[in-house]
């Protein structure tokens, strides 16, 4: 069964670190700062590729991390921006944020792009921090961390071709012969409970996805048997291959089978009958099959191409696959229900509260815990190996109101404050 839902991890590249450097060339007195900025980290970008049909590739790789930007260099040389990480997805992929459960992208058109995780900006070099009062700063920023998240990919497209017919007419056998699919095969009804899918390739290199759908019986549109499950899957196919047991092994009239199945498709959704249909007369290697085929053609009384085959002996399979591939090339996709004449476009606006720059909680041992996206980003972009950077970080905390908030929570001189995996001593 093809994968149609998968959870993956994506992370944009971190920005490159800024550089602390000074000009030291001969004959350049008081050269001043010369540290370049870091380069931007790469984005993780989903790009729709119409050549892909499934999410199978994501079963083997579920972590995608874009490269980080190059670090800044001396002589005011900026680091190189990192290249984006391109991840190809099939048309019809829906991207859902795993934390909020919101749909963040619906990717349908070939070449459509969506940045799922943005890369961080490069850290500023010490040239950026030069002021009249501090013309030679020993301070630079680390690169901004890239965005990271878990997302769920869902693929609603099932197949190009759907095999329909009464139970045990040979649909599963046909699929197993023309593709690498391994459906459950037996001569009792409803062996196929869920759709089996297989990729079919013709001798001239064309390929398509074929679905062996659960068996259909009279009354399916009312939920009898496996009706609704079957019909929901066939809604998505572009070409219907109607398989008929021409040997009449079950004792039913092949023409009656044909009429009943088409009536069920018509009852469920009018648009199903608009799809092109190929009639396949299966089990032609069995006794009386040829006689039944002639009777079927007389009753049908239409100039409709019928492909006599035997899934077991592979008689007629090659011609059938070529006909399906030819039909797919000229068949567009079908909307599930009739289109409204005038589409109404709605835009949803949401009021999003501005997130607080930090939160303070307290552990059982009395340690104060600082958290929050903004304060954690400031921390990660601070170079703690340089005293000026540490002093700047302390000023940033004060300007955000962290010191006052800690005092209000009862923090005293010498108390431990924890941010991420690092501990500091509170100095009042």
From Swiss-Prot:
InterPro entries: G_OBG, GTP-bd, GTP-bd_Obg/CgtA, GTP-bd_prot_GTP1/OBG_C_sf, GTP1-OBG_CS, GTP1_OBG_dom, GTP1_OBG_dom_sf, OBG_GTPase. Residues 350-428 form the OCT domain. It is found in: Cytoplasm. GO terms for biological process: ribosome biogenesis. One of its GO terms (molecular function) is magnesium ion binding. GTP binds at residues 165-172, 190-194, 212-215, 282-285, 310-312. The keyword Magnesium applies. Its cofactor is Mg(2+). Pfam families: DUF1967 (PF09269), GTP1_OBG (PF01018), MMR_HSR1 (PF01926). Gene3D superfamilies: GTP-binding protein OBG, C-terminal domain (3.30.300.350), GTP1/OBG domain (2.70.210.12), P-loop containing nucleotide triphosphate hydrolases (3.40.50.300). Residues 1-158 form the Obg domain. Its EC number is 3.6.5.-. The keyword Methyltransferase does not apply. GO terms for cellular component: cytoplasm. Residues 159-329 form the OBG-type G domain. It is an enzyme of class 3 (hydrolase). Keywords: Cytoplasm, GTP-binding, Hydrolase, Magnesium, Metal-binding, Nucleotide-binding. Mg(2+) binds at residues 172, 192. HAMAP family: GTPase_Obg (MF_01454). Monomer. PANTHER family: DEVELOPMENTALLY REGULATED GTP-BINDING PROTEIN-RELATED, MITOCHONDRIAL RIBOSOME-ASSOCIATED GTPASE 2. An essential GTPase which binds GTP, GDP and possibly (p)ppGpp with moderate affinity, with high nucleotide exchange rates and a fairly low GTP hydrolysis rate. Plays a role in control of the cell cycle, stress response, ribosome biogenesis and in those bacteria that undergo differentiation, in morphogenesis control. Belongs to the TRAFAC class OBG-HflX-like GTPase superfamily. OBG GTPase family. This is GTPase Obg. It comes from Anoxybacillus flavithermus (strain DSM 21510 / WK1).
